């Protein structure tokens, strides 16, 4: 359905697939790049910093079968971007990690997700769905004003001396 809409309105579908290994429901993620019927409308992006928890590594990729888009992206990248040599060497090495790395990280994230969801569901009025992938979730909190609540968290609340805030 998304592919049909994108094709009929000449739109792009952008898939950030940096967390594709972190799917908990048992079904593998179907990459947008697999949709052969919309080669000009699909863009897949990935990033080392998200995929491997390599904070600060400013290196990633953009993938598309749209030759015009890729030609323009390459021009921009050649003129504006420069990844540090050390980041390139370290990032290349990260792609040699085996599947056991992602299995261990996936299990840790799943444990954390399950804990957060269980604790949130103990709070009256909180509504949240259990995420099927990645490591973040959206929750509706029983507050009248989200801005005031966030300010209160930053100025008046702590958990054992630690500040608690929204990302």
Which ranges hold each PLM region?
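PLP-dependent class I/II
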Residues: 1-167
């Amino acid at each position: 359905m998304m592919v049909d809409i994108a094709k009929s309105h000449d739109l792009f579908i952008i898939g950030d697939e940096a967390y594709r290994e972190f799917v908990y429901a048992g079904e593998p993620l179907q990459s947008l790049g697999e949709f052969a019927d919309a080669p000009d409308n699909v863009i897949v992006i990935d990033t080392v910093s998200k995929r491997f928890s390599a904070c600060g590594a400013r290196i990633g990729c953009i993938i598309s079968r749209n030759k015009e888009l890729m030609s323009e992206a390459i021009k921009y990248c050649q003129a504006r971007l420069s990844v540090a040599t050390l980041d390139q060497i370290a990032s290349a090495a990260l792609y040699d990690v085996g599947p056991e790395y992602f299995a261990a990280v996936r299990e840790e994230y799943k444990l954390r997700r399950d804990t957060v969801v269980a604790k949130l569901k103990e709070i009256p009025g909180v509504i949240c769905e259990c995420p099927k992938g990645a490591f973040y979730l959206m929750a509706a909190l029983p507050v009248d004003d989200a801005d005031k609540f966030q300010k209160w968290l930053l100025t008046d609340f702590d958990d054992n001396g630690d500040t608690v805030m929204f990302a």
